[in-house]
Amino acid sequence: MPHMDPAIARRTLVAGLPVALISSCLAGCRSQRQSAVRESSSSSHGNLSAPAAMRLPQGWTWVAGSDIPVAKATLRLPVTTTDGTGRRVTIKNANRIIVGGEDVADILAALGWRKLIYAAPTNSVAEAAVNAPKHYGFSKKTGMEGLLSIDGTLFIGNNPMRHGRAAAKFREAGVDAAVVNDRQPIGGKIRAVATFLGDPKAGDKLAGAVERQLVEAAAITRARQGHRLRILAVTASGAGGANAVMGMGTASAEMIAACGATSVGVRAGLRGYSVKFTDEGLLSMKPDVILTGDGDLKRWGGLEGYLKAFPTLAQTPAGRKNHVFVMPSEQIKVSGVGVGAGAIALARALDALSR
């Protein structure tokens, strides 16, 4: 793990933008940038065109990937395999799957197993997880009682550190359980989920499609000369609803890496949705582009809330040039099958900045 930049150490956020600057920015909220990158999706993952109810601040860019791949998988159980914790597990019944993370739900849906998804985390943004029949909270405060009380037949976690113990508890209760290793690329995650349910060939097909998209994204930006663009991805979905910087192990980090750019969060040694940053630290990292999700912008209540959440970003190179990209939250925050399509859209938008 990279050494954490001391300037990114955690502290309380403080306000501090000139009123004139905020007023000017808010006035620009009335129109959208005409040159924004707009790609709508006709896939089963829904319409990814810019939300009609959301008007982006002037100069900001809507970036959305299209052509999200799917594959038709066949359920073949029982299966005995090694999961992400290194344990040999047997899966016999997948009629009601409890997913430990929405990325697992997204992958299941892309493999044609949407109807098997029974319960998902309450804070999900992925469509397949949001539409699950049941939702649950799982944290240090809630413990595992609520999770274990769900009448599922299979638990699939997405993080050995977070879900290894939960999976063991499920097995003790007679419920099948397996965990995906979250530290592997998206292709490995897809193959793991498909293998758990008995169709590794379908997993290879879907993973291959996403991996080819990531290669395509890299090719778009490979010809770009000069320094690697620095991208800062921010969210309103940190622990306890805190504002956070996206670091290692996130969908945004994988997309940024595929584009040949530098993730500010990863470079600072941050992992997941991290609150371990300072306003001054973000300013010193001099991001060329700021990236966030449409759900985050909505949660902040628009531009004014965003400026209060990250008061120094307007003073960064990205802020001064209005190089702020907004993506569908389902693409920027879910390490699922949309990562490749999102990376292509992001690469095209970055390429446009370099011309």
What are these model-derived regions, one by one?
Residues 143-160, 175, 279-292:
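Proline-aspartate-enriched helix->loop->beta-strand connector
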Residues 246-274:
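His/Asp/Glu-enriched short active-site or ligand-binding loop at hydrolase and phosphoryl-transfer sites
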Residues 96, 189-190, 195-198, 204, ...:
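Structured C-terminal subdomain patch of bacterial secreted/periplasmic proteins
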Residues 2-103, 201-233, 352-355:
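Bacterial Sec-exported substrate-binding components of ABC uptake systems
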Residues 91-95, 101, 105-106, 144, ...:
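Extracytoplasmic/secreted envelope proteins and their assembly/folding machinery
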Residues 163-165, 178-192, 196, 226-254, ...:
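Extracytoplasmic ligand-binding site segments that recognize negatively charged/polar headgroups
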Residues 60-62, 70-74, 78, 96-150, ...:
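A short, structured surface patch at a secondary-structure boundary
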Residues 88-91, 105-110, 125-129, 239-244, ...:
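Short, solvent-exposed loop/turn elements at domain surfaces
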